[in-house]
Every structure is written in structure tokens, then in C-alpha cells.
């Protein structure tokens, strides 16, 4: 790249040297000794309007020293924008102050950096195979327990409930029924319709029932049921 720039600079200087070279006036049958640049109205110009590079240097590069770097002009501090640093620490300009410590020296144990604690290595655990064990279920054999039977304490009392007598009669004006069982339960009831066709029409019932208790005693209850409700009467019923 530097060689290319040197060649370009040499060509530029050569062209500039040719432009400023002195050319003596040559004889011309038209102009003879008269300068073509002298203004003379009416004089014939051989080739008017054609560009003549010998008349000026328009468009040609002319090298000069404008813009060249000037290392030291002796005016530092006079013009604005120059760096005005200080050679001492704390002065204006923020001068760089190096360290006197030798960083290349090995400090050994005196230097204590951040300690890295290695993580514990966890070894994989191999699962222990477990063999299933069959446990037979315990069979419980049922035990028969006989129910406790309490014999009756009364004489002539038993639990037979078969019907040994039955009577039933139903009529438009009333009804009547009677039944007796093997365990000596006896019941009879009769009902009659009274005040037929009036506002006080209703049925009047009268009956009784009796049975032999566990103590061998016969208990009887007589009752009526009418417009006054159900009324029972017996020797063992409190008055």
C-alpha cells in the first residue's frame, strides 16, 4: 500500500512539473510574432471555443504543503483544544500515575484469593431388590353359640299362637268378630252404627281381650270406643 501511494505521488509531481515548463514561442504563419492572447477585435482566431490546457491549470492537481502535519509549532497552550496535562499527580489534566508495585512478582501464600469449595461427589445408590413374601390369610372358623332359652315360670303358659276359634259377621248396621288362639288369647269386639241419617251418625264399639301372662295370671281388658274416645278398663290398669 505504501509503494502504491509513493508511485501516485511521483506521477503527480511529474505532471505538475510539465504544466509549469517554459515553452518558447514558435513561428506560426497566421499569428507570426503577434501573441494570440492580445485582444484585437475583428482578428481571425484559428480555432475558437477549443479548450487549450496551456492557457491555465484549471482542473489539474497542484501539490502543496497545505494540511501537512506540523509536529511542534511552539504555540502549545495558546490555541484552544490542546492537551494541557500535568506531570505531577493531583495536577490538572488527570496525568497517568503508574504503580511502583512489581505485579510480576509471585506473592505465594500472602495472596489469598477466593477459595472454591468443591462439591461432594454423590455416588449412585443401587437399589436392593426386594423379594415379595406370600402371607396366607388367617381363616377363622365360626363357632356356633346356641341362644339361651328362658323357660316360662307360670304353669299352663305356652307360646302357641294358632287360632282355634274364629267368628266374623259384617252387616250394614254393624259388625261382630271373635277369635281365640292356642296360647289362650281371647278377643271379641262388636260395632254398631247409631244415629243413622243424622249429623250425629257414628259407630259405637264395645269389646274385650284377655291373655295369660308369664306369671300364669290371666289379664283382661274391657274397652269402649264412641264419641267420647277410647276408654279401657282392667284390674291391672291404674285408675
Swiss-Prot record:
Residues 49-58 have a biased composition (Basic and acidic residues). One of its GO terms (cellular component) is chitin-based extracellular matrix. InterPro entries: CHIT_BIND_RR_consensus (IPR031311), Cuticle_Struct_Prot (IPR050468), Insect_cuticle (IPR000618). Keywords: Cuticle, Signal. A motif (Cell attachment site) lies at residues 73-75. It holds the Pfam family Chitin_bind_4. Residues 172-239 form the Chitin-binding type R&R domain. Induction: By juvenile hormone. One of its GO terms (molecular function) is structural constituent of chitin-based larval cuticle. Residues 48-73 are annotated as: Disordered. Residues 1-16 form the signal peptide. Major cuticle protein of the integuments. May interact with both chitin and epidermal cells to form stable cuticular structures. This is Larval cuticle protein LCP-30. It comes from Bombyx mori. The gene is LCP30.
Amino acid at each position: 500500500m505504501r509503494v502504491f501511494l509513493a508511485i501516485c505521488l511521483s506521477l503527480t509531481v511529474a505532471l505538475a512539473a510539465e504544466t509549469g515548463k517554459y515553452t518558447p514561442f514558435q513561428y506560426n504563419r497566421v499569428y507570426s510574432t503577434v501573441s494570440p492572447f492580445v485582444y484585437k477585435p475583428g482578428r481571425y482566431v484559428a480555432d475558437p471555443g477549443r479548450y487549450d490546457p496551456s492557457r491555465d491549470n484549471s482542473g489539474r492537481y497542484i501539490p502543496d504543503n497545505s494540511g501537512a502535519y506540523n509536529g511542534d509549532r511552539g504555540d502549545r497552550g495558546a490555541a484552544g483544544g490542546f492537551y494541557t496535562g500535568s506531570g505531577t499527580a493531583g495536577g490538572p489534566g488527570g496525568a497517568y500515575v503508574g504503580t511502583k508495585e512489581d505485579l510480576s512478582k509471585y506473592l505465594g501464600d500472602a495472596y489469598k484469593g477466593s477459595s472454591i469449595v468443591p462439591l461432594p461427589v454423590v455416588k449412585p445408590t443401587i437399589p436392593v431388590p426386594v423379594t415379595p413374601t406370600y402371607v396366607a390369610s388367617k381363616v377363622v372358623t365360626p363357632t356356633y353359640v346356641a341362644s339361651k332359652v328362658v323357660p316360662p315360670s307360670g304353669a299352663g303358659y305356652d307360646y302357641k299362637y294358632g287360632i282355634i276359634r274364629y267368628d266374623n259377621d259384617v252387616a250394614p248396621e254393624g259388625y261382630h268378630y271373635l277369635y281365640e288362639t292356642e296360647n289362650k288369647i281371647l278377643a271379641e269386639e262388636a260395632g254398631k252404627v247409631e244415629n243413622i241419617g243424622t249429623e250425629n251418625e257414628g259407630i259405637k264399639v264395645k269389646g274385650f281381650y284377655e291373655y295369660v301372662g308369664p306369671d300364669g295370671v290371666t289379664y283382661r281388658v274391657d274397652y269402649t270406643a264412641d264419641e267420647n274416645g277410647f276408654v279401657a278398663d282392667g284390674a291391672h290398669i291404674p285408675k
